[in-house]
Swiss-Prot record:
Belongs to the G-protein coupled receptor 1 family. GO terms for molecular function: G protein-coupled receptor activity; olfactory receptor activity. One of its GO terms (biological process) is sensory perception of smell. The lineage of its organism: Eukaryota, Metazoa, Chordata, Craniata, Vertebrata. PANTHER family: OLFACTORY RECEPTOR (PTHR48001). The gene is OR1E1. Residues 50-57, 121-139, 220-236, 293-314 are cytoplasmic. Its main location: membrane. It is a multi-pass membrane protein. The chain crosses the membrane at residues 26-49, 58-79, 101-120, 140-158, 196-219, 237-259, 273-292. GO terms for cellular component: plasma membrane. Pfam families: 7tm_4. This is Olfactory receptor 1E1. It comes from Homo sapiens (Human). Residues 1-25, 80-100, 159-195, 260-272 are extracellular. Odorant receptor.
Length: 314
């Protein structure tokens, strides 16, 4: 329980973004617009997949869960950022901070696992097209989604419980716009070696292994594509996984840039900008990537609009 924790502080202070006072209103409007775009874009994908029977396939089951994850991922941090910018109150209660950290880890990790499931789906579709329906059965797809939720829930809960056992005294200023786990560890008064070891070990399992699995899937995909005799077949195969590859590059590019390429003397501003990329920009762009480069999504949108027009004309 929170009351049993040995903390001597009741809340933290989020420094937020390094924005000049005269730019506050403009930045507030910008982030609000980006957040609303993220909500509407991902909700549109979820609704289209739900309403259009043509999209009731394994790929779009994973995509609907990915859109839900993106929607929630942004909702974990951006509303609090907007509230702090509007009220000029940077405080966040201790329990709320740990809750935010938990859901941030949960939905961030969930996206990583769902991208692996989608890569496997594309691998089966291209390398074993005749056996696709048999391999990607509804039972397997639901099992992959359920396993993703279970593993990410366990991982997020593990880090949250380890953080809750730490003692925080005096210094409660977090140089970030959300309760980042690494920033919280720097404020801890007690020994954090267990936390750091778990981050190192679990980080490899949650981020590195999924990334390697995706690379392995695409290596097999490229190998199979190069065996296709016609250039038309090659283009069709690449277009099948183009959207997913774009999302993978966007997600892992920002995460790797933040956690693997950051040096000891990297600035807080740089870390904040990189974090903003994968918490705000990436979830906002994903719906555009899947809608603009995906004929199935465009067709589904046209059919749903046509059905609504027909309904209202009756």
């Amino acid at each position: 329980m929170m009351g049993q924790n040995q903390t001597s502080i009741s809340d933290f202070l989020l420094l937020g973004l390094p924005i000049q006072p005269e730019q506050q209103n403009l930045c507030y409007a910008l982030f609000l617009a980006m957040y609303l775009t993220t909500l509407l874009g991902n909700l549109l994908i979820i609704v289209l997949i739900r309403l259009d029977s043509h999209l009731h396939t394994p790929m779009y089951l994973f995509l609907s869960n990915l859109s839900f994850s993106d929607l929630c991922f942004s909702s974990v941090t951006i509303p609090k950022l907007l509230q702090n910018m509007q009220n000029q109150d940077p405080s966040i209660p201790y329990a709320d901070c740990l809750t935010q950290m938990y859901f941030f880890l949960l939905f961030g990790d969930l996206e990583s696992f769902l991208l692996v499931a989608m890569a496997y789906d594309r691998y089966v579709a291209i390398c074993f097209p005749l056996h696709y329906t048999a391999i990607m059965s509804p039972m397997l797809c639901l099992a992959l989604v359920a396993l993703s939720w279970v593993l990410t829930t366990f991982h997020a809960m593990l880090h949250t419980l380890l953080m809750a056992r730490l003692c925080f005294c005096a210094d409660n200023v977090i140089p970030h716009f959300f309760c980042d786990m690494s920033a919280l560890l720097k404020l801890a008064f007690s020994d954090t070696r267990v936390n750091e070891w778990v981050i190192f070990i679990m980080g490899g399992l949650i981020l590195v292994i999924p990334f390697l699995l995706i690379l392995g899937s695409y290596a097999r995909i490229v190998s199979s594509i190069l065996k296709v005799p016609s250039s038309k077949g090659i283009c069709k195969a690449f277009s099948t996984c183009g959207s997913h590859l774009s999302v993978v590059s966007l997600f892992y590019g920002t995460v790797i840039g933040l956690y693997l390429c950051s040096s000891a003397n990297s600035s807080t501003l740089k870390d904040t900008v990189m974090a903003m990329m994968y918490t705000v920009v990436t979830p906002m762009l994903n719906p555009f990537i899947y809608s603009l480069r995906n004929r199935d999504m465009k067709g589904a949108l046209s059919r749903v609009i046509h059905q609504k027009k027909t309904f209202f004309s009756l």
